C-alpha cells in the first residue's frame, strides 16, 4: 500500500559500521547486526518511541519495533540509500529531492503486527510503513524471482511522496494538473476521481482500492509501477500483478506509456536506473 495505515485505514501524514556489541533484548535495547555503512541505534523520538530502534540514512529516519529483524531493517536502509545514491558514489543523485524529504521530516516505520501502527504521528511529518514479513532481502539477488520484496515499493513511495512531489510539483505533484496525473489519466483510461466499478478495457493501470484517492494515492502507486517496471522489478510478475498493472517491463512502458517513460527517464530528475538490491557500497 502507499501509506501508513492505522487499523488498515489509509492516511498520508503531513505529517553507521558499528561494534559487535549486543545489548540485552528489550524495550529501547537493540540486537545489533553488522553493516559496513549503517548503524542500528536505540530510539526514543517523540511520537515514535514505540519503535525501539532506528537507522538514519542521509538524514532520513527508518524506525522499527523490536520484533522486526535487524537484517531487514538494515536491508531497508540499504535500499533507501541505493534509491537516493543509485550509482553508489557517495553523493546524492538529486539533492533537491532529499532536501524536500528532510523538510517534510520523512520517515519509514517497520512493523511486525498491524497493531504496531496504532500510534499518533507528529503532524508535521510524512511517513510510510513497511512490514517485517513482506520484506524479502533476497528477491533481487535471486533474479527478481520468489516472493516480492515490498521494500522496493514502500521506500520508493516515501521518496516520491515526501520528495519528488514537493521538489517538482509541476511534474510529480499530487494534483490534477501535474504531468504525472495527466499520464496516469491515460493509463487508467480516463480521469476518475472515484474508483470506477470497471476500468476501460484499454486501461493498463487499474487500481481498485477504494481508500486510494486520486491525488494522494493513485498518483504515487502509478509512479511506483512505472518506475519499478522500467528498472526490471516486475518482469517476472505479470501473472501476479496483471489485473492492476499490465506494463511489467521497460519495453512495454516505453512503447505503451511513452508519457511516463519520458518523464521518468528525463535526466533533469535523475531517477534511479539500477534496481536496488540492498547492498549499498558493499
Kindly give the residue locations of the regions a language model identified.
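Acidic/His-rich structured neighborhood in mature extracellular/periplasmic domains
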Residues: 57-197
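Sec-dependent signal peptide recognition
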Residues: 5-14
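Conserved aromatic-histidine-acidic binding/catalytic patches
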Residues: 64-71, 143-147, 208-220, 244-252
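N-terminal low-complexity, Pro/Thr/Ser-rich intrinsically disordered segments
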Residues: 23-58
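Domain-level detector of nuclease and nuclease-like folds
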Residues: 170-171, 177-234
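Pan-zinc metallopeptidase signature
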Residues: 216, 220-282
Amino acid at each position: 500500500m502507499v501509506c501508513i495505515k492505522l487499523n488498515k485505514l489509509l492516511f498520508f501524514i503531513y505529517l553507521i559500521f558499528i561494534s559487535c556489541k549486543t545489548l540485552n533484548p528489550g524495550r529501547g535495547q537493540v540486537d545489533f547486526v553488522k553493516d559496513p555503512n549503517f548503524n542500528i541505534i536505540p530510539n526514543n523520538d517523540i511520537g515514535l518511541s514505540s519503535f525501539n530502534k532506528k537507522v538514519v540514512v542521509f538524514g532520513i529516519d527508518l524506525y522499527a519495533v523490536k520484533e522486526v529483524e535487524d537484517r531487514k531493517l538494515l536491508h531497508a536502509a540499504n535500499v533507501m540509500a541505493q534509491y537516493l545514491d543509485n550509482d553508489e558514489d557517495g553523493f546524492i543523485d538529486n539533492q533537491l529531492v532529499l532536501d524536500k524529504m528532510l523538510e517534510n521530516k520523512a520517515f519509514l516505520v517497520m512493523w511486525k503486527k498491524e497493531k504496531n501502527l496504532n500510534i499518533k504521528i507528529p503532524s508535521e511529518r510524512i511517513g510510510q510503513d513497511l512490514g517485517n514479513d513482506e520484506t524479502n532481502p533476497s528477491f533481487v539477488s535471486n533474479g527478481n524471482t520468489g516472493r516480492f520484496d515490498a521494500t522496493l515499493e514502500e521506500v520508493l513511495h516515501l521518496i516520491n511522496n515526501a520528495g519528488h512531489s514537493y521538489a517538482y510539483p509541476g511534474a510529480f505533484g499530487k494534483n490534477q494538473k501535474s504531468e504525472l496525473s495527466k499520464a496516469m489519466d491515460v493509463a487508467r483510461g480516463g480521469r476518475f476521481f472515484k474508483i470506477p466499478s470497471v476500468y476501460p478495457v484499454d486501461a493498463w493501470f487499474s487500481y481498485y482500492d477504494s481508500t486510494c484517492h486520486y491525488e494522494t494515492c493513485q498518483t504515487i502507486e502509478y509512479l511506483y509501477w512505472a518506475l519499478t517496471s522500467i528498472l526490471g522489478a516486475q518482469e517476472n510478475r505479470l501473472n501476479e500483478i496483471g489485473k492492476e498493472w499490465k506494463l511489467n517491463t521497460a519495453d512495454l512502458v516505453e512503447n505503451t506509456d511513452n508519457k511516463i517513460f519520458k518523464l521518468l527517464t528525463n535526466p533533469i530528475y535523475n531517477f534511479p536506473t539500477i534496481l536496488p538490491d540492498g547492498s549499498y557500497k558493499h
